[in-house]
């Protein structure tokens, strides 16, 4: 009712200035995203610094997301899970239409990414889909691999970020307990690619941005 009482010129004052400010701000954000490679450590912690030194040959989540962006089709539907890897990824994909991004939101259901992208593909079988999850969250719903590999199910792409830990919980631990943590590490020898193969799906391990971009492109093409 209130909107009906507004004139057709309501909000015209400085409208173009506001548009210009929004465009300038968004452009600055995009430039910042392209320059960020790693996360900074919280005061009093050295977690990220030690990880970069120990595993200098591995992609950071931000590098991985830039590689993913480069390989994603324009009309893709994506889903994300909870955790640091997917939270960082919220800043990267852009969409021209609605109903393209499935996310657990504030409900925080661990294991959401995999089953939600399966549902998206069943609902939109001709549209390429990509699900994302960290290795911790994926462990909650990975049993769905034994179902989705059946011949009557449409193919999907599922990306698993491997940092061998419950990263969000580890961060909470080191912040609250003087850089100490317990019960957050995952088995580095476990291969989700091999589990996928055992379930009848195709498993691919990538270690570089170039490999990741190519794998995304190929997997989406093979969904058709």
Regions found by a protein language model. Give the residues of each.
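Thiamine diphosphate
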Residues: 1-5, 12, 66, 87-224
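Hydrophobic residues within well-ordered, non-membrane alpha-helices that form the packing/core
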Residues: 3-6, 10, 33, 72
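Flexible, glycine/charged-enriched surface loops at secondary-structure junctions
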Residues: 11-29, 36-39
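General helical secondary-structure elements
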Residues: 14, 22, 48-50, 167
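Alpha-helical interaction segments
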Residues: 18-19, 37, 55, 91, ...
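Active-site diphosphate/adenylate-binding microenvironment
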Residues: 27-124
């Amino acid at each position: 009712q209130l909107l009906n009482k507004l004139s057709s010129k309501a909000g015209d004052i400085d409208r173009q200035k506001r548009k210009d400010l929004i465009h300038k701000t968004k452009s600055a954000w995009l430039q910042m995203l392209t320059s960020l490679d790693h996360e900074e450590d919280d005061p009093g912690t050295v977690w990220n610094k030690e990880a970069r030194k120990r595993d200098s040959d591995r992609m950071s989540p931000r590098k991985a997301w830039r590689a993913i962006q480069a390989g994603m089709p324009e009309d893709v539907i994506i889903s994300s899970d909870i955790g640091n890897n997917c939270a960082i990824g919220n800043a990267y994909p852009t969409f021209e239409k609605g109903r393209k991004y499935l996310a657990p939101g504030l409900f925080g259901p661990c294991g959401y990414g995999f089953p939600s992208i399966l549902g998206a593909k069943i609902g939109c079988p001709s549209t390429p889909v990509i699900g994302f999850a960290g290795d911790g969250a994926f462990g909650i719903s990975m049993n769905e691999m034994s179902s989705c590999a059946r011949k009557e199910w449409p193919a999907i792409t599922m990306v698993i970020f491997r940092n061998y830990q419950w990263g969000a919980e580890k961060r909470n631990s080191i912040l609250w307990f003087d850089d100490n943590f317990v019960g957050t590490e995952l088995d580095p020898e476990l291969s989700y690619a091999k589990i996928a193969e055992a379930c009848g799906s195709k498993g691919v391990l990538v270690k570089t941005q170039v490999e990741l971009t190519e794998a995304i492109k190929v997997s989406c093409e093979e969904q058709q």
